[in-house]
Amino acid sequence: MAKHLFTSESVSEGHPDKIADQISDAVLDAILEQDPKARVACETYVKTGMVLVGGEITTSAWVDIEEITRNTVREIGYVHSDMGFDANSCAVLSAIGKQSPDINQGVDRADPLEQGAGDQGLMFGYATNETDVLMPAPVTYAHRLVQRQAEVRKNGTLPWLRPDAKSQVTFQYDDGKIVGIDAVVLSTQHAEDIDQKSLQEAVMEEIIKPTLPTEWLNASTKFFINPTGRFVIGGPMGDCGLTGRKIIVDTYGGMARHGGGAFSGKDPSKVDRSAAYAARYVAKNIVAAGLADRCEIQVSYAIGVAEPTSIMVETFGTEKVPSEQLTLLVREFFDLRPYGLIQMLDLLHPIYKETAAYGHFGREHFPWEKTDKAALLREAAGLK
């Protein structure tokens, strides 16, 4: 492969779409805490002065949607009308119904192992050995930039920062290996009283330099910090936000394919979410086992049917054992039926709100990031 550039982006927890994702997953977590078998499909819309929470929820739990919403917005940092959005005064509207019984009859079964998929669909999982967390570097460092923005905003290092921010990182590759960072974009909402020069200097020193590895930066690396020159109006005042609109930020930054289904607000019976997590788990264990340098898994389902309709393993020519053997190993060591993967990854717990900002993958404490099958795979493949 010749020299090429690859770019990925991320957005902060204060981005309007991410506010929506976090509210949806906060509602999901609150319900799962009381009722692990609940069926939840929670969608959120945010705009200046208002939040609308809707969807289909079937549960024995009772949760205070308004309180959950306000607490989530407050934790993000929208606590004053000067920011264009205020957790204490925004309107919170609710429009929630129940899951269709037509769907439910295909999911719930007398034998849990025969639990059907909550919908048809295709999901992808991916892993690569180019970073320590077995994720693509561009999206990994894009996430870390906006995580650092939130950190220095909340700890008072840069008190004039506001919650809304975006990052973008362009990496240089030569024959598939990283050789440097070509460009960095960071746009952050800020208070009215900070001048552009001071902002750019502070962002460079407190956010960019502590986050990006120095060996990948050079004299030709380009930096674009608030390139429009002003970013005072942000958050839901600047743009409306919707659950599920940042699916590439949530996954692999465009370096792997995507089945199209969003994650946030969905309980684990929805394979859009749970099977995408399982596919990441499979791909990561294959790479961690040294069976391939890069691995992409596709899995697909039919609504109401337990067994996947297909499983595909793609290793882009980096496999250390035959591709056919990899597919057999996946089928042997990973139960990708809905009930099986829920049990395998222990998904019926309130763990989802934290996933809703800074990426669902590449953070080691999530159960789908375990590499506990790597040694088994390596042994079964006959590698020493």
From Swiss-Prot:
Positions of the UniProt region annotated as Flexible loop: 99-109
Cofactor, free-text remark: Binds 2 divalent ions per subunit.
Annotated localization: Cytoplasm
InterPro entries registered for this protein in UniProt: ADOMET_SYNTHASE_CS, S-AdoMet_synt_C, S-AdoMet_synt_central, S-AdoMet_synt_N, S-AdoMet_synthetase, S-AdoMet_synthetase_sfam
GO molecular function terms attached to this record: ATP binding; magnesium ion binding; methionine adenosyltransferase activity
GO term, biological process aspect, one: S-adenosylmethionine biosynthetic process
Positions bound to K(+): E43
Alphabetical UniProt keywords: ATP-binding, Cytoplasm, Magnesium, Metal-binding, Nucleotide-binding, One-carbon metabolism, Potassium, Transferase
CDD domains cross-referenced by the UniProt entry: S-AdoMet_synt
Phylogenetic classification of the source organism: Bacteria, Pseudomonadati, Pseudomonadota, Gammaproteobacteria, Enterobacterales
Biological source species: Klebsiella pneumoniae (strain 342)
Designated name of the protein: S-adenosylmethionine synthase
